From Swiss-Prot:
The lineage of its organism: Bacteria, Bacillati, Bacillota, Bacilli, Bacillales. InterPro entries: DhaK_L_YcgS, DhaL_dom, DhaL_dom_sf, Dihydroxyacetone_Kinase. Keywords: ATP-binding, Cytoplasm, Glycerol metabolism, Kinase, Magnesium, Metal-binding, Nucleotide-binding, Transferase. ADP binds at H38, G39, I40, N41, A79, S80, G120, M129, R166, D179, P180, G181. This is PEP-dependent dihydroxyacetone kinase 1, ADP-binding subunit DhaL. It comes from Listeria innocua serovar 6a (strain ATCC BAA-680 / CLIP 11262). Residues 6-194 form the DhaL domain.
Amino acid sequence: MTYDKDWALRWLNDFGERVQENKQLLSDLDQAIGDGDHGINMARGLSELKKAFTEKEPADLTDVFKTAGMTMVSKVGGASGPLYGTAFLNMSKAVDSETIDAEGLTKVIEAGLEGIEKRGKSHAGEKTMIDVWEPVVNALHQEDLTDDVVEAALQKTKDLKATKGRASYLGERSIGHLDPGAYSSALLFHAMLQTEVS
């Protein structure tokens, strides 16, 4: 498998479409345990990203992720902008050639996870997007990432008590709700798995 600039563009455009389709659901999930604007914020940021890609085609794979990072930081409100932004910027730094193989992709996604952990001062088990990213990275290392793995990771956030972010104010009452950031991250990785390599 070889992943290149065109693949990454298709992946992130598909992610944008999935977020647009699930905008209301993401905001509803966020309404239960957060500010209620995750869907709107993410949809706006990804729509701006699509525009950025159209106006100036990225030079290479690194540039795709760098553009994504800068756009998410500047156009997405709330905590998710800086977190996704940092993830993509870290991913751009982990790309070391025009194309990457499966091992390279694992390294790139892992760099994204590390960026989120550092920026959010968080780790797995705190009911955040990390609870999807970490199982995805682990599965990539084992070469067995599937849509089921992504979905299982997302569903597990329902039983976790939030100890980070706005949701942590709810304490025990955050249990029983899916984490919105984990949900949008699941959309990101479903899109990645469904984006065919050219």
